Amino acid sequence: MRKMTNARQSKSKGFTLIELLVVVAIIGILAAIAIPQFAAYRQRGYRSQLVADVRNAATGQEAYFVDHQTYGSSCTTLPGFTSSALTSLTCSGTASGFTVSGTNSGAPNYTCTWASANNPPLQCT
């Protein structure tokens, strides 16, 4: 009787190969679903970051105008403004208006422009 109990216990330890293959297959299916969704989330994040940087630069242009009665000729003249690491901005301004354009290297083929003369001023394509 004792030998039979020991034999059963030694056979019941661990998982079978089939059980492990089923678990690996389930993990593979979940990964196949999750990875494309993750890439889409990243794209939306990069686009949101670009919009935020363009809006912040536009706010910086308005702050510059309050102090100098003209808009800043470049983004480097804006007080206390720095864009995100992946965002590249171009600013131009005169006494009558300004334009801020930007791209984000994480979201290729997506550009946002804030032109003070436009209504609405922010346009992204």
Where do the language-model regions lie?
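Alpha-helical hydrophobic helix detector
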Residues: 18-37
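Conserved catalytic core of two-component sensor histidine kinases
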Residues: 24, 51, 58
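Glycine/proline-rich, flexible active-site/cofactor-binding loop segments
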Residues: 15-17, 36, 105-108
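N-terminal leader/signal peptides at the extreme start of proteins
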Residues: 1-15
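Aliphatic-rich helix starts adjacent to a transmembrane/signal segment
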Residues: 37-54
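Regular, well-ordered alpha-helical segments
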Residues: 32, 40-43, 59, 63-66
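N-terminal/domain-start alpha-helical segments
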Residues: 15, 20, 71-72
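Periplasmic/extracellular, small/polar-rich flexible segments of pilin-like filament-forming proteins
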Residues: 55, 59-125
